[in-house]
Structure formats: C-alpha cells, structure tokens
Amino acid sequence: MRVFNSTIGKVKDGQMEAAVGVAGEAAKLVGRHGGDVRFFMAGAGAEINSTLFSIDYESPEALGRAFDALGEDAELQAFMARVNGPDSPTVLTAQAMGMELPLGRTAKAGKGGVLEVHTSRLNPDRMEEGLSQAAEVCEFVEANGAVNARLLQLTYAGLGSGLTVLTWEVENMQAHARLGTAWFTDAGLALQAKSMTANPASVQVSSELWNEIPL
C-alpha cells in the first residue's frame, strides 16, 4: 500500500526563483532517506502561487522509517528552521498524509508534467460503489492518454481527513485538452452521469491542476 506526505506552500511575491531553489534543496535532504519526491506549482483551482511538495513511499513502514530518520537528521532540522523563518521565500500553509486505496487494477506507469486532482467526500455506506466508479474513471483516463491514475484517501489532513482524492497525470496541456475532449464522447458522458444523480456515491469538493517543476 503506497502512502504519501504532502506540504502546501505559498510563495511570497517576487520570490518564485528562490522558492524553487529551496524546494530543490529540500528534495535532496528528504530524498536521501527514501521516497519519490516531486514539486508542483498551482495551475488552476488552487490559490495563486501555491506549491505542492509531495513524497510517495511504497508502504507505511517505509514512511515510518524515513520519518524516524528525518527526525534525527540535524542538517534537515536546521534547514526546516530556515524555511520557517522570516526570510524564507515560501510560507508553509498545510501538511497532509494519506494512502492509496486499492481499486483492483494496476495503474499505467509513468509521470506527466500536469497533475489533475479531484477531491470528493464519500457518502455514508457508499465506499464499495465509490471505489468501483473510481476504477472506471481511472481506466477511462488512462485509455485517453493519462498515466498513474489512482484514488487516495487523506488520513491526516485536518478538516479534510477522510476525503478521497482521484488523481492522474498527463504529458502537457495539449494532452489535457485531448482528455477533456474525450469526456464529451458517449463513453465519457455516460461516466460523468454516474456522479450527477440525486444520490451519488460521492460529492465533489474541489478540482485542481498542478504543473510539475523539475528539481
């Protein structure tokens, strides 16, 4: 079971270049203890100049080992003190942890430059139906150019705890546009209709696009 830890930040005015540099430094410090580290900038749906620093781990045990090591890393602790100081180019605003939910399928391997994120709240007693619909969506988007389609659940995220997050990646905005067109085919419209009933399995909370910034 893959798990993740993510940090949302807000870049101060005129500090974008410095913020990317700090993220690169963080990736090196954190990455030496394991995990797949990635950095994104808000494209649409999120607050302007927001950033997403995400670390994926293969299992809860891997995350636990990494976090214990991070807690004892003096260099990282000094770095975090600087990042949280008044001269930091970024203000850290939120942190969350979560896990990937099993959908009975294997996601198409790969990464894209654009991350699409849809956050929802499952209605009571509708988990099985929600997972089934998420699996259908993942199959559909991957058949139309996306990769790494999966369903996550926020486990430690403040008021967002328990929400599900459907994500996938596409190569670029042209690929995103092609996928958008596919949603208006017969198959895409039929899939959308399942979430637009009077009593859906889940209710959408937000949708966002994030652009990956190579570190």
Model-derived features: where do they sit?
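Short S/T/G/P-rich N-terminal loop/turn motif that feeds into the first structured element of a domain
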Residues: 1-215
